[in-house]
Amino acid sequence: MEKASQFIHAWHENFLHHNTDFLDTILHDEVVFFSPVVFKGIHGKSMTKLYLTAAGESFNMEKFAYVREVHEGLHSVLEFETFIDDIAVNGVDIIEWDETGKIINFKVMVRPFKAIEKVREKMIESLEKISN
């Protein structure tokens, strides 16, 4: 069994149920997060947790679903679908794990362009709300 497929269970159990406290244990201290709306990588556990928490608030988790997964070695690719304000969002989470099951790289890609615009709008709202 691939290690990534073992590690992903904690992600599913917690993120999909809005439990963001688990991010403190699953994220590596030096994780790098790549947002679909920010060009450069976002470095560190605290900033990655902030962005993933905002994503959880932005991505309409009631309609959010992972529809396909591929795991190989220490890599996972999870395709997701959701609707945000009636705009269909399709994307992938690309996760790289270390040997202990901590996330060291997390990249989110989104399509179509209209969805990217909506994700950007909602992420800004969520980040402002969380930061205040």
Give, region by region, the residue ranges found by the protein language model:
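Short acidic-aromatic low-complexity motifs
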Residues: 5-26
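Basic/polar N-terminal segments that are highly enriched at the extreme N-terminus
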Residues: 1-6, 128-132
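Generic alpha-helical secondary structure signal
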Residues: 2-6, 21, 46, 114
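A short glycine-/small-residue-rich loop at the edge of a beta-strand within enzyme catalytic domains
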Residues: 2, 14, 39-43
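A solvent-exposed, acidic/Ser-Thr-rich amphipathic alpha-helical stretch
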Residues: 21, 25-71
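A beta-strand edge to alpha-helix "cap/lid" segment located at domain peripheries
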Residues: 56-132
